[in-house]
């Protein structure tokens, strides 16, 4: 019992290193859609078409390596006015990187993304795999790189990288995506959520991986239109008090 209490305290206290973490957006009639791992020619063009068709907005957390490989897709995202943020260069777990490698990865990613949009401040990013969002050491390394870093986490994940597992057809995948949206919309906590989706998820072995995001997004946009839910941007957290740097009052999953 004492050991569990000590672990919980360690996850809540720091030496002033905790950064703000964004997990929700204001109001029950809005959600924020976010995509990790892009850009990808398998997904980005269709995603942008769907967002434009439904007059919706999204935040794209891009991997530097993919952004460098597909610059025209990043240009298209920026041209449509969607937010572009960092998701690391190689999509490596940041809680397993050395401080030097950590800083190089972040700097290299921003050097790529800065070609397409101004460097944001506060500097919102998403950690690959969500790795280290609960680690004071990772927060300290982020703060030493840029003092204005804020972590964009999420409050609803579709775990979409699993939807094509053992899936034998596009039609079956469509059913799974539709069911995932029905379940999400029935959740009382859905309104105000930051939603986590993936573009052609890194590490997925399924041949249908590239079809997941377009199918899921289409079902999502149809669903929120029926419920009168709008899309909004991920805004910087306003909880930047001195005390919040030392104590986290709310656990983040």
Q: Predicted segment positions?
A:
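Juxtamembrane helix-loop transition sites at the ends of transmembrane segments
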Residues: 57, 174-176, 249
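Sequence-level motif detector for i,i+2 pairs with an aromatic at +2
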Residues: 28-30, 190-192, 243
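Catalytic domains of cell-wall/extracellular-matrix polysaccharide-remodeling enzymes
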Residues: 68, 91-230, 236-239
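C-terminal accessory extensions appended to soluble enzyme cores
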Residues: 235-253
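Hydrophobic beta-strand scaffold residues
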Residues: 58, 84, 150-151, 231
């Amino acid at each position: 019992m004492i050991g569990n209490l000590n672990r919980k305290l360690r996850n809540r206290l720091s030496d002033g290193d905790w950064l703000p973490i964004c997990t929700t957006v204001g109001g029950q009639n809005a959600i924020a859609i976010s995509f990790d791992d892009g850009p990808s020619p398998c997904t980005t063009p269709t995603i942008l078409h769907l967002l434009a068709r439904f007059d919706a907005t999204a935040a794209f957390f891009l991997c530097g390596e993919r952004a460098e490989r597909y610059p025209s897709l990043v240009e298209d995202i920026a041209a449509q006015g969607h937010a572009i943020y960092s998701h690391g260069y190689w999509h490596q777990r940041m809680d397993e990187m050395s401080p030097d490698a950590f800083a190089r990865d972040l700097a290299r990613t921003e050097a790529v993304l800065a070609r397409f949009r101004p460097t944001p401040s506060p500097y919102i990013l998403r950690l690959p795999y969500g790795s280290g969002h609960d680690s004071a050491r990772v927060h300290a390394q982020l703060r030493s790189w840029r003092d204005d870093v804020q972590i964009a986490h999420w409050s609803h994940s579709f775990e979409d990288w699993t939807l094509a597992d053992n899936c034998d057809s596009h039609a079956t995948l469509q059913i799974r995506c539709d069911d995932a949206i029905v379940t999400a919309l029935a959740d009382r906590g859905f309104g105000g959520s930051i939603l986590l989706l993936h573009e052609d998820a890194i590490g997925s072995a399924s041949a249908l991986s590239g079809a997941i995001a377009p199918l899921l997004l289409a079902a999502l946009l149809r669903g929120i239109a029926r419920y009168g839910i709008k899309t909004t941007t991920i805004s910087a957290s306003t909880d930047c008090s001195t005390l919040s740097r030392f104590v986290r009052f709310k656990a983040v999953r």
